[in-house]
Design a protein with these regions (language model features):
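ATP-dependent small-molecule kinase catalytic core of the GHMP/sugar-kinase superfamily
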Residues: 1-123, 136-174
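Conserved glycine-rich beta-strand-loop-beta hairpin in the small C-terminal domain of fold type I
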Residues: 131-133
Length: 174
């Protein structure tokens, strides 16, 4: 039912059930709730996975990306062809929508390029259809060093915003 409201609703419902587990004790299938998932289809297929312990810096370049435009472009690309079946691999960072957005939104492409050039993240991946980009770290020392370097970084554009967080939790600060 949630997908009829919006493609991201099924994941949001699952994630919020996880985050509010104490208040929702006793509900059937709450055990399936997770703060992390592999999402496919148009967002209606949500397979819960255990969250990986990452330190994360989220970046937003201060522009809007049309989710509708990105999905329509992907739909046109796939029209008449079937998606290759991929085995879910939770060790791999991948976003089917990233190529279109990076190709058509120079600001996002510039952001990703600069993050990869100047920071020491293990992985850099766009979130959803964009424009937010996440830099993932397995080591807190590298994460903290990059966070500190960001405070005076000349490569950061004035319109960009960033937030520091940890995966699987609500420890958000900026």
């Amino acid at each position: 039912m949630g997908v009829k409201v919006g493609a991201d609703v099924p994941f949001s419902i699952m994630m919020n059930a996880c985050l509010n587990a104490d208040e929702l004790k006793g509900l059937p299938q709450l055990v399936e709730a997770s703060c992390a998932a592999i999402v496919s289809g148009i967002g209606e297929v949500v397979d819960a996975v255990m969250p990986r312990p990452y330190f994360v810096i989220l970046f937003n370049p201060g522009i809007a990306v049309s989710t509708k435009e990105v999905y329509e472009a992907i739909d046109r690309k796939l029209e008449g062809a079937e998606l290759a079946q991929r085995e879910a691999d939770v060790n791999r960072f991948y976003n089917e929508l990233e190529l279109y957005t990076l190709t058509n939104y120079r600001e996002v492409q510039n952001l990703v390029s600069r993050i990869r050039e100047h920071l020491h993240a293990d992985e850099v991946l766009m979130s959803g259809s964009g424009p937010t980009v996440a830099a993932y770290y397995t080591e807190e020392t590298r994460f903290e060093a990059d966070c500190e370097a960001l405070e005076s970084a000349r490569w950061v554009e004035p319109t960009w915003r960033y937030w520091k967080t940890k995966s699987g939790g609500l420890n958000l600060w900026s």
